[in-house]
Amino acid sequence: MALTKSRDYVSVKPATEAVTVEQARLHLDLDDNYYDSQLNQLIIVARQRVEQDSRRSLITQTRVMSMDAFPSDGIIELPTVPVQSVSSITYVDGNDATQTLSSSLYLVDSNNTPSRVVLNDGESWPNNRGHYDDVKVTYIAGYGDTVGDVDEVAKFAMLMLVSHLFNSPSVTSYGTMNIVPIGYELLIESLKWGQYP
């Protein structure tokens, strides 16, 4: 795939988390809700870490992939899975006007990993202005809207991190941020896809 520089970010955060505070409490064997506020924060941190390490979006969220130009081979590979849908593809034309590409020009293949946006036969990407972040693909990613939709391995990896962070506050000190619990990497290996440096 021929791609110019690209980046991907969350534009609309998940409305709910991939594991519940109740699940975290059960995993930690806590009897009351005294630590719920802390657990909520740790759940967010754990989800973000699992998503980063696995290149998967665990719960429904809106993401934006921005590129300097359309790929020369006609295929846009989205950097995270699973992809539910593509909301829009916009670009800045030669007159500095933002245009929305008609969805009739392309097909979204979300059945493969990575998910791809492919031009329909006979179509071509329009010319863009050629500046930084001129092309933006807005898409919905995640296993679904509820905890029950989320992959069980991903949920367990999150709970491992929540437990690790809760029971070892020192892991947030300088030089120890990359320490993860034993077994976490094995779970991530089963989830992640693509080439990693």
Question: Each PLM stretch: what is its role?
Answer:
Residues M1-P197:
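Divalent metal-cofactor coordination and adjacent catalytic microenvironments
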